[in-house]
Amino acid sequence: MTKLLATRSARIIHPSLALLLGAAAATLTLPAMAGDTSAAQQLERWSAQAGTPGNAEQGRDFFNARHGGEWSCSSCHGNPPVKSGEHASTGKDIAPLAPAFNARAFSDTAHIDKWFRRNCNDVLERECSTAEKANVLAYLIGLKP
């Protein structure tokens, strides 16, 4: 009887254990970015909306320019933005912006839209155009280790 209970218990536990182990294994194989998009998808989106492909050279120039104000994108994100930066007024740490140096960069559409809106308003005192976003992202995607 004990042997029968052990066997039945093993059969009952085994599927649950298998599901648990399977879920754990699947979680371990997920990529580091957990968002709903990628840098390449964002570039494609903005290029399509702008009606022109992103231009990395124009993106680099835009990223480093002050646009008549006190700050540029590089004021906080660094030049080039491949290491952690620091917010110019708050001192808060900012993760590397270039996707090759930060797998989570440009992986969440809502987060991307929110921060482009805020940061463009800080630097330009207006929202960035889709062409400007595409150019900056083309520049950032081109930065490699």
Please name every model-derived segment:
Residues 35-67:
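Electrostatic cytochrome c docking/interface patches
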Residues 113-145:
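C-terminal capping alpha-helices of c-type cytochrome domains
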Residues 1-12:
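N-terminal secretory signal peptides that target proteins for export/translocation
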Residues 15-27:
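Bacterial N-terminal signal peptides
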Residues 68-80, 136:
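The canonical Cys-X-X-Cys-His
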Residues 29-31:
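N-terminal signal peptide c-region/cleavage motif recognized by signal peptidases
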Residues 94-110:
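Short microdomains enriched in Cys/His and/or Lys/Arg
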Residues 85-92:
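Short cysteine/histidine-rich zinc-coordinating motifs and their immediately flanking basic loops
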